[in-house]
């Protein structure tokens, strides 16, 4: 049995796919890994490239061709077909750091944890800058119990798709079924399997290279505004999923998942309260969503009051949504004058 399945979701990436696959297909690990290249209805030469790699590396590369269903659909296929003990997603325009990846696979052969967490790096190719992200207070090689760990050690950072490798049986046991034809589904991947993760190991290895080829590529607010219906669909799914399972979670898992959801909800409120230029729509949408959240999960609703701008908007029925190019700090100053007190 292979120790690791690496899923490579593939959609119109003929320019980058070879770099991605070449970083994985190293002589030292060929017999230990499975590479699932799942083509999601590409219109360019991506499928032909992946087929050629399958022919060249028949014991390692498995090519799957399917109709377009979005990023989530490729993960669904990958989890179903994976033969490796562990499972990792590597987007086809990203790559791995060769030296640390070899060490990573070597360590995995002896690993028993439900999940393995590593570091990653954002490569801003458009300006040549590189950002390194690590979990500074976790110990290299140490196994932690998620139900017992002091979550303060994470400093508010959660485990992302780029940093996380799950045991395949844990993914399947969680019942994870990613939404299809929907953006931002990585949040499902970050949350749902955690319900079945009791132990995780941390490797201080610089594995994942997250490619940012354009200044506007990263998940900035303009993209969120443009795709806000996708974001709303995803967040409502997460809220309803969590509401259905929270009573069965340990206190630590509740706190950890709520930490992720608070971050995600913070982004969602920011889209409407600060960045959407269609102010009438933003006003109506955020009031409707806020009422939905209060009705669906009072605990999450109350938790958001720790954010000053959400609290002030609620107290004024969202009359302080950003208007006509004004900066948010000006809105906050006005809110403070009206309310007669300062935000904490």
List each model region and its residues.
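Cell-envelope/extracellular polymer assembly enzymes that use nucleotide-activated donors
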Residues: 3-5, 34, 188
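Short, well-formed alpha-helical segments that are part of the catalytic scaffolds
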Residues: 13-26
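A conserved acidic beta->alpha catalytic loop
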Residues: 23, 39-48, 69-70
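Short beta-strand/loop segment that forms part of the nucleotide-sugar
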Residues: 32-41, 62-67, 92
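Glycine-rich, basic loop-to-helix element that forms the pyrophosphate-binding segment
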Residues: 66-82
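Donor-binding/catalytic cores of nucleotide-activated saccharide
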Residues: 71-75, 92-203, 208-226
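Membrane-interface aromatic/basic loop that binds lipid-linked glycans or pyrophosphate carriers
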Residues: 113, 273-344
């Amino acid at each position: 049995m292979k120790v690791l399945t690496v899923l490579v979701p593939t959609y119109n990436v003929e320019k980058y796919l070879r770099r991605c696959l070449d970083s994985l297909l190293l002589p030292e690990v060929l017999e230990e890994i499975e590479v699932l290249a799942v083509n999601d209805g590409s219109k360019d030469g991506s499928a032909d490239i992946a087929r050629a790699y399958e022919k060249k590396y028949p014991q390692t590369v498995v090519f799957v061709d399917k109709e377009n269903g979005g990023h989530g659909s490729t993960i669904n296929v990958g989890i179903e077909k994976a033969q490796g003990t562990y499972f990792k997603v590597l987007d086809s325009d990203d790559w791995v750091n060769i030296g640390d990846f070899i060490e990573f696979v070597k360590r995995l052969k002896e690993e028993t944890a439900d999940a393995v967490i590593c570091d990653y790096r954002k490569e801003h190719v458009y300006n040549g800058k590189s950002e390194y992200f690590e979990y500074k207070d976790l110990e290299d090689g140490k196994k932690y119990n998620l139900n017992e760990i002091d979550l303060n050690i994470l400093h508010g950072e959660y485990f992302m798709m780029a940093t996380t490798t799950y045991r395949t049986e844990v993914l399947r046991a969680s019942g994870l079924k990613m939404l299809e034809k929907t953006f931002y589904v990585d949040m499902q991947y970050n949350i749902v399997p955690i319900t079945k993760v009791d132990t995780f190991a941390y490797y201080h290895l610089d594995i994942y290279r997250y490619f940012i080829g354009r200044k506007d590529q990263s998940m900035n607010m303009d993209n969120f505004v443009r795709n806000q219906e996708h974001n709303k669909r995803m967040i409502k799914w997460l809220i309803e999923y969590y509401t259905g399972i929270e009573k069965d979670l340990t206190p630590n898992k509740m706190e950890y998942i709520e930490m992720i959801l608070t971050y995600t909800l913070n982004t969602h409120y920011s889209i409407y309260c600060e960045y959407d230029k269609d102010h009438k729509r933003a006003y109506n949408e955020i009031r409707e969503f806020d009422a939905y959240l209060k009705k669906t999960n009072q605990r999450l609703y109350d938790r958001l009051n720790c954010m000053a701008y959400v609290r002030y908007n609620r107290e004024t029925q969202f009359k302080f949504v950003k208007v006509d190019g004004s900066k948010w700090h000006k809105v906050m100053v006005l809110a403070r004058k009206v309310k007669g007190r300062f935000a904490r």
